[in-house]
Amino acid sequence: MVLPALEQGGYTYEKQVVIGKRLGGRNHKVDLILTTRQGRKIPVSMKWQQVSGTAEQKVPFEIMCLADAVAKSEGKFSKAYLVLGGDGWTLKDFYLGDGLKQYLKNFEAIEVVKLEAFIAKANKGIL
């Protein structure tokens, strides 16, 4: 569903790409690197939560790592997406709203979106 939407929107992509080091020193692999028609690169991390579990607890750390990657990319990335899919999220509204703003800083370049919203934006070519 995601990949056809990206193609429809004019994006090319690479899957499972290491974009640098995570906070703490391990490799930071994102699910996708999109390339726009204008040549901009956009990292995308996708999290699926079918039932309540640990993926939910990893969201703040992933946002921090994506923000760090954008900041250290020397202009290669101007933004990144964290896509949340599935019905098992108890904190989805908190993450999609402004819940993290009082706890995290410097993550303005990271857009946290529902899977459906990401697909709609991809289809329209407006990521």
Where does each model-flagged region fall?
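Acidic-basic catalytic patches of nuclease active cores, encompassing PD-(D/E)XK
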Residues: 1-20
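Alpha-helix C-cap/termination motif
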Residues: 9, 35, 72-76
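Amphipathic, interaction-prone secondary-structure segments
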Residues: 18-21, 26-31
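Active-site beta-strand-loop-beta-strand hairpin of nuclease catalytic cores
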Residues: 28-44
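Catalytic cores of nucleic-acid endonucleases
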Residues: 41, 48-99
